[in-house]
Amino acid sequence: MKYAAVLTTVAALASRALGAGVSGTAEGFASSATGGGSATAVYPTTTDELVSYLGDDEARVIVLSQTFDFTNTEGTTTETGCAPWGTGSACQVAINKDDWCTNYESSAPSTSVTYDNAGSLGITVNSNKSLIGEGTKGVIKGKGLRIVNGVENVIIQNIAVTDINPKYVWGGDAITINQADLVWIDHVTTARIGRQHYVLGTEADNRVTLSNNYIDGESDYSATCDGHHYWNVYLDGSSDKVTMKGNYFYKTSGRAPKVQGNTYLHAVNNYWNDNSNHAFEIGSGGYVLAEGNTFADVTAAVEDSSFEGELFSSSSDADTCSSYIGRACKANSFTNSGDLSGTTVDVLSKFKGETVATADTASTAPASNAGQGNL
């Protein structure tokens, strides 16, 4: 009887492993990402196992079925930081990372900061990995993920990354991509993050798709001191093609996204809800095609004062898109929000011949479809 029970358990575990895998395929620029492919799934049970699986050289399908809490695993640091945005209880304060306070905010009041060291640098993710959450169980708390230094072919789907030193700017990012290729992030929830929810660094990040993610900006602390997170999506690569489709931006106040460097961004069917400052910030080298997006209660859909890039988002010229991407563009929708009007046709030429995501009519669907647990 005991032998039979063991066999039953082994068979169940094997069936579970074989049944695990990525749901669907990416749209847009990272459409050929396969991650860990058909590798037999592994189920880490400790933070050390998770770090090992993500960082080794094997193609892997890694399934998260619990919370991995990195808080206090690397100790804490208490030192002097600064308060550039005010000393109110709802204001973020800054760590003096790389002498940032000293060099850039020397006139800001000094303040004592105590932060968790684990959040400062994310977990290294190597090539050919699929990181998948089981239901709503897969959570990484207190530490982010880093896809950097030549890594390629990574899929992250249906997990949550949360609680990375939310009081402290420079306290850590949720997902960092820098000098990488073929990265698909899908149905991921990020919440209560000190710095960026997503950051694509200054090296070439090539082909990236961010789809159906929930950027939850609600926080007790923010740089705008109003419970709306300012640091959200920062796209700064030297040769980047990014598809951003079906994402839900909630309670943000800026950099949602910030686009510059040499970045082609196709922003399609996203939903911005309750933004107290601005959504898009388009700097030099940012080329944005924005269509089928919904803006509700967004003070400014784009920040005019910093605009140095190029934008096509015109509903009146939507048919112009046909000559470049093979179909008319979808109109953006605005409710109690600033407008997003850009007619730079040169942007469309950047997307000609590229793998461009499909577009639906603008809607609020991402509010119920995006993030962990909504596959």
Swiss-Prot record:
Q: Where in the cell is it found?
A: Secreted
Per the record, pH dependence is:
Optimum pH is 6.0. Stable over a wide pH range of 3.0 to 7.0.
Q: Which GO terms describe its cellular component?
A: extracellular region
Q: Which Gene3D superfamilies match?
A: Single-stranded right-handed beta-helix, Pectin lyase-like (2.160.20.10)
Name the major location.
Answer: secreted
Q: How does activity depend on temperature?
A: Optimum temperature is 50 degrees Celsius. Stable up to 55 degrees Celsius but inactivated rapidly above 55 degrees Celsius.
Return the EC number: 4.2.2.10
Disulfide bonds, paired cysteine numbers: C82-C101, C91-C225, C321-C329
PANTHER family on file = PECTATE LYASE 18-RELATED (PTHR31683), PECTIN LYASE A-RELATED (PTHR31683:SF16)
**The protein's name:** Pectin lyase 2
